[in-house]
Amino acid sequence: MIDPLENGLFDIPDYEQIEDETFPPLPPPLSPGRAELEDDLFGNAEGEEEGEVSKLAEVPVAKRRTVKRPRPKLDANRLISEKGLPALRTLFEDVKFKGKGHETENLKLLMLKMENWAHRLYPKMQFEEFIDKVENLGGKKEVQTCLKRIRLDMPITHEDYVAEEAEIQVPEESVPSGDGGFPEDPFIHSTPAPASLTEEQQQRIELNKRLALERRLAKQKQLESTPISIQEDADEPSTSSSGQFLSEENPKTTSNQTPLKHKPAELQESPLHDNESSSHIANGIIDDDDDDDD
């Protein structure tokens, strides 16, 4: 058998007698003192420059600006906004409730619409909590004023004021002319509704126009009827005074005319009475002035 050591097949150097070279442990990554350790270990000039730079005062880094978005609160101002109580006026316009025997379904539909309205107004609150909060806000002065304006059909939102301006600009041609009517102004004309308005808003504007026209006609009739009553009241004292004046004059005239109309029975039987009745002169008496003229 061939000895491998003799032929040098496995001529491997003997490292058992050689000591291992010791190396210092590596510093942790991205440690603040890494540059100083490198200077001490390797003594490079570049390391010295980096060490000097690291010793300089650190430049303050600009802090990232955070935009704070305040969380909306459910208060009186939010409750009387366009999405709040004024939105309830048109909330059930497209809802059709069923007849008798479907009260449960109608109630569910009503509560569903109210819950939808509450979620749009304040999404971060449950419906039960929302109801309690609205009940507490109901005593606020702003909320009470808003409810009164809704009951009196007064303008609240911007759309209501636009509709009110459209009512004022109703054409005068549609109103019948009269003595007690309003003065006609040729410069007042109706402006067409803007194209951005929805069909529902246009219907509301038309309805407000009709209501304004009806109120205007009623006021015109009232103005036409009031001058007549005032004139009648003013004429009553004059007629009474004139009647009293005539009644005071009548006794004098009647007293003067009684001798002519009612003659004594002795004169009626005399022949002179017959000549007076057949004469063409009134009362059968000839004035002396007429005789002189003849």
UniProtKB/Swiss-Prot annotation:
Keywords, in A-Z order: Cell cycle, Cell division, Cytoplasm, DNA damage, Mitosis, Nucleus
Gene Ontology terms describing biological process: cell cycle phase transition; cell division; DNA replication checkpoint signaling; mitotic intra-S DNA damage checkpoint signaling; positive regulation of cell population proliferation; replication fork arrest; replication fork processing
UniProt protein name: TIMELESS-interacting protein
Cell cycle keyword on record: yes
Ranges of compositional bias, category Basic and acidic residues: 263-277
Role description: Plays an important role in the control of DNA replication and the maintenance of replication fork stability. Important for cell survival after DNA damage or replication stress. May be required for the replication checkpoint induced by hydroxyurea or ultraviolet light.
InterPro entries (alphabetical): Csm3, TIPIN/Csm3/Swi3
Subunit relationships: Interacts with TIMELESS, which impairs TIMELESS self-association.
Compositionally biased region (Polar residues): 237-259
Gene: tipin
GO MF terms, alphabetically ordered: DNA binding
Record localization: Cytoplasm; Nucleus
Composition skew (Acidic residues), residue ranges: 37-51
GO cellular component: chromatin; cytoplasm; nucleus; replication fork protection complex
Residue numbers spanned by region Disordered: 20-54, 168-203, 218-294
Cited PANTHER family: TIMELESS INTERACTING-RELATED, TIMELESS-INTERACTING PROTEIN
Segments for region (Interaction with TIMELESS): 74-150
Record family assignment: Belongs to the CSM3 family.
